[in-house]
Amino acid sequence: AWAGLSVESLDEEATPRERRQAYARDITYATAKEVAADWLRDRLAASRASPSRSVRTLAGMLAEGVALPGRSVTADRLVMRGLAHAIVDEADALLIDEAVTPLIIAGDSGEAADERRGAAFRAAATIASTLAEVDDFKVDHAIREVTLTPRGRRKVAAADVQGVPVLAGVRRREELVVQALSARALHEQGRHYLVNEGKIVIVDEFTGRLMSDRTWRDGFHQAVEAKEGVVVTRPKETLDSISFQRFFGMYRRLAGMSGTLSEARRELWSVYSLPVTMIPRHRPSRLRRLPLTAFVRGEDRWRAVVDAIVELNRVGRPVLVGTRSVEASEALSIRLDQVAIPHRVLNALRHREEAQVIAAAGVRGAVTVATNMAGRGTDIRLGTGVEELGGLHVIATELHESERVDRQLAGRAARQGEPGSVQVFVSLEDELFVRFASLEAAAAQRLARDGVVPPMVAKAVARVAQARAQALAKRRRSDVLQSDDQLRDSLGFAAKGR
């Protein structure tokens, strides 16, 4: 206890009894995913014990900590005691960027994971491999959607599916083929997922970490399994679901903190009624920002990144290089090996030595290549003599959809009044420009000289792309907020029918 308050932390291995004990304390430390999952499990237990009550009513009672009828339910099943007060670290990441991420409680669908089901997904993947983009299907990269053309639909309808009864119906066949095309065209191994010990493991796009306990819904996970040639697993049934946006909106008192909240102030107020207050810096910032450098070709960008690392390493400055995917971090590592630059890599594949890698990232001569795992909340301390060299230098090799995420990476340098610098290298072939500023990128390419886009032009195109990306993300968050009630009610009806 501290200041008369009881405190306890909660981890994913905790038993229901340990969870109940942790939530009984005055202050409970836990991840948002753990807290929201516990609340969903409580709601499921309550709905099964009180089938006559609507899910909306039960949700309100659980949020307020109102005692539920049925002594055994409260004593043996529920672990939480209401949603009173929450303080959220890195609040913009959770309340804005991950707001639409659905937290799902899944159970066995009851469908057999037999050879027929696996054969259906594999057959759909085979059919998809015979289709040509543009002629047979179109990919909208902005909204990440695949649609069949009339010619593509005819080819799918004419495909030989003898021996695959699941695909006998043309509509179901089209659904699985579109999923297979989405898995092929929009989801890359090394960026969106990894194949680990014969299983598909999703990579969290915000943190760069593996999510071993997560699967995609509605058969898409099975489509990716078929694409990669691993065992097609049994599909899961969604028992209950809620978005972080809806969940945190139920707290009576909500607060949070982050170094990148100012850009999200309007949405935080409109969705959560939370004002944003700026806290003055403890010490003046000494961060030096170098101009954005944009190349037409991705290959030229990577050459420039390696050249910059070599030059900085020659004088002994530590360098942190941020990449957006596991694949990119591994490819850059190979390039650094080719020029004999000692370095360490931190990504979802190489995470076991995370603490040691971060601890050494600020020492003289260190070169660290990392995904978003080295972004938010990472404190890199400078080694002896590094401050005199100019501090940590951060290199971003690609822009994110949100400028706030880019600022989080840049913020690893020049902490607590120390010196530091940041430099951004991009290519017009990057996903951000392909999805959100293809026309502007084409115009910028015409203005390029020797494969390099003028800095002011590059900055303008990047600003347009990020603005469009954020506008789309905001619309999605608004749609989720409106549909969450409908989803909750439909799930509640299904629960009462079981």
Please report, for each region that a protein language model flagged, where it lies by residue.
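Conserved P-loop NTPase motor core
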Residues: 1-451, 459-498
